[in-house]
């Protein structure tokens, strides 16, 4: 093991807002600023001690130049702080953490903030032929959220977009013979866990309240929105969302959401020099890639790779966070690795909480750290699937 490993000294996320919900009045850069500021404060360092900020963002259209730079300056960090925006679809926030680790390990930087941010509610529509002009007939609008975030780029449909990610979730369900009933049961449990975690204080360590300015006074958002919009009794009766006789529904798919998450990383020696107590050590990270149409099972490979890098066995890991882009994604990883559900997403996952795509990779890592801290667990693995056939994973060990 590295004698001077990279450690995480703080981790924070916003509550997750529903589509056009509580957080929709803020841009992604506003949400990013909230978590960058909170992560620096919770780390116990001065803003001018951060050398670089890496933030994932999948839907940057309409936000202006360099969203990560905007978020950095809005957070009160000085103009001397470098900032980079990353796009690896749903893995953007986690890849930011992985690259922060590597920057520090290479000696390029000493203190880095890494995470992700997304306001899916504010993703604009695009006019593809607007620059050259529409000479005659009907024009076309493309939904930036769908086209650049939620549709497969390798299988174009007649409407100009790509195949919906949900169609590939149906393929995954068929491959593993996951029934509608099994997926519904998974979603119901995820919803129960997420609601309970919001109510019993399980998320208190990891979340930062978001203040929304308004003419009638500020509104403070302190808990995840979507778990309290769900009527569990309706889940078994929902229509299939993607295929007429399919098994995947809106309840077993992650919801369109807004949110952000960030972590502060440095070497262990740097933390000691500053008198800081790390939250955890980043033991290993991995990327796994395969055919685009099978992104749903890519976390299986990413988890296998990160466990091998860490020198761990599946059973030696106390908790897992495996992003629920669809229930079948997490179910497949659990089945392939023989992981019991009581070790996975113990506070609920994205089918209940929501999936702000640029932020989710960092969000699952922050939530993993919070869950390990609450339960007294030591080892954890966070992973998520990525459109295009990829997945990432990070292994951490609590300090």
Residue ranges of predicted features:
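Condensing-enzyme catalytic core mediating Claisen C-C bond formation in acyl metabolism
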Residues: 1-26, 38, 232-297, 301, ...
């Amino acid at each position: 093991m590295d004698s001077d490993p990279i450690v995480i000294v703080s981790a924070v996320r916003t509550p997750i807002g529903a589509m056009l919900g509580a957080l929709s009045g803020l841009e992604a850069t506003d949400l990013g600023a909230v978590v960058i500021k909170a992560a620096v404060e919770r780390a116990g360092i001065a803003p001018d001690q951060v050398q670089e900020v890496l933030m994932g963002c999948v839907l940057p259209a309409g936000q202006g130049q360099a969203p990560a730079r905007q978020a950095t300056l809005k957070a009160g960090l000085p103009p001397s702080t470098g900032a980079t925006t990353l796009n690896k679809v749903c893995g953007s926030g986690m890849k930011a953490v992985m690259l922060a680790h590597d920057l520090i390990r290479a000696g390029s930087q000493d203190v880095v903030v890494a995470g992700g941010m997304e306001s899916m509610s504010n993703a604009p529509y695009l006019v593809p032929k607007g620059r050259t002009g529409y000479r005659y007939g009907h024009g076309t609008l493309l939904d930036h959220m769908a086209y650049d975030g939620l549709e497969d780029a390798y299988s174009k449909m007649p409407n100009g977009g790509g195949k919906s990610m949900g169609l590939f979730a149906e393929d995954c369900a068929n491959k593993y013979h996951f029934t509608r009933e099994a997926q519904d049961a998974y979603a119901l449990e995820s919803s129960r866990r997420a609601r309970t975690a919001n109510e019993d204080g399980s998320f208190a360590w990891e979340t930062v309240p978001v203040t929304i300015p308004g003419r009638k006074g500020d509104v403070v958002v302190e808990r995840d929105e979507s778990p309290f919009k769900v009527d569990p009794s309706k889940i078994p009766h929902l229509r299939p969302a993607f295929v007429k006789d399919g098994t995947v529904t809106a309840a077993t798919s992650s919801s369109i959401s807004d949110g952000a998450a960030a972590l502060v990383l440095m070497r262990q020696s740097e933390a000691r020099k500053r008198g800081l107590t790390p939250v955890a050590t980043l033991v290993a990270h991995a990327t796994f890639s395969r055919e685009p149409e099978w992104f749903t099972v890519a976390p299986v490979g990413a988890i296998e790779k990160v466990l091998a890098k860490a020198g761990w066995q599946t059973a030696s890991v106390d908790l897992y966070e495996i992003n629920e882009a669809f229930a079948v994604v997490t179910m497949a990883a659990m089945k392939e690795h023989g992981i019991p559900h009581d070790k996975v997403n113990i506070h609920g996952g994205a089918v209940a909480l929501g999936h702000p795509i640029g932020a989710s990779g960092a969000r699952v890592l922050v939530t993993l750290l919070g869950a390990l801290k609450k339960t007294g667990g030591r080892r954890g693995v966070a992973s998520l699937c990525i459109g295009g056939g990829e997945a990432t994973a990070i292994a951490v060990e609590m300090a």
